[in-house]
Amino acid sequence: MNVYFECKDTLFVNLPRNNLEMKYTLAHLEFEHYPLLLAPMEDVSDPPFRYVCKLFGADVVYSEFISADGLIRDSVKSIKKLDFEEFERPVGIQIFGNAVEPMVEAARYAETAHPDVIDINFGCPVKKVASKGAGSGIMNDIPKMVAITKAVVEAVNTPVTVKTRLGYDNEHREIVDIAERLQDVGIAALTIHGRLRTTKYSELADWTLIGAVKNNPRMHIPIIGNGDVVDGPSAKYFKDTYGVDGLMIGRASYGNPWIFSQIRPYLETGEELPLPDVAERVRVSRIHLERSVAWKGEHIALLEIRKHWAAYFKGLPNFKPFKMRLMETLNVEEVYGILEEILVYYNDCGL
């Protein structure tokens, strides 16, 4: 068993070197640069997608969220989500639920996979989750939220983190108080998505309360910001304006694993790298498919990667006929052939 953490007090710590440099550490794991994290995303952040994001510089990656009830019932789908490769480390496993005992049992189960972090999802706004008092739905019951967190922290040796939102609705923007209470029961870090449960993704993220948490003198754990980080300029703005200890990138990485390698130089030097050309999109989408086939088998891989095709080739003129063919075939060699056709067609177009 690999032990990646020495204590539960800190996830990201900035250590000054020579009064000029900053070193970012994950317990004894150290980053030479500002941390960029891939968000846990249902039906997206599986091992093949995490692999390609890791190739392009995601510092920490997370599993899709896993139902506590599913894990303790030995649901095949839930257990499969515990899979990860050593290449992915540091890696977090995220669980969700609405009661103490199932969450404790699920956390212990997740710990047997030896992740670097166990993350609790208190942020999902999807109705089927929130309506049952899980995800961001639990923000209606902050004492229960704190009780679950405390019990999970005490039940496992792996550092526990939380991902949540600003509050349930406009009348309950309570994240400053919530953050203190979660810190007090022992979480190692807190990721805050800058929207409410009720706004889902319909408005721009509000980072002012994320900044308020980060600048609260009572807070000493790392605060990771999430929401509307879409490119280098937005990443630099949120980092510099609100002082968060890391940035978590979610939907903007979908079909765009290059976002991590584009943000990094912008943060460090202000350099804006060009968007990937068609050859690079074909190359990386093929890697994604190959990893998916190896992990899931050809049939399931070809069904599940369909949602990624439009994202990988977003913005290309006249792509619809290729997309339709990619969506229809269940033969992996045929997909590879279509990808080669895409490469030839757009090379001829000068793209």
Range-by-range predicted roles:
Residues 21-26, 32, 41-116:
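Glycine-rich, positively charged N-terminal anion/phosphate-binding segment
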Residues 104-118, 122-132, 143-221:
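Alpha/beta enzyme core
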Residues 41-43, 66-68, 96-98, 123-125, ...:
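Active-site beta-loop-alpha junctions enriched in small/polar residues
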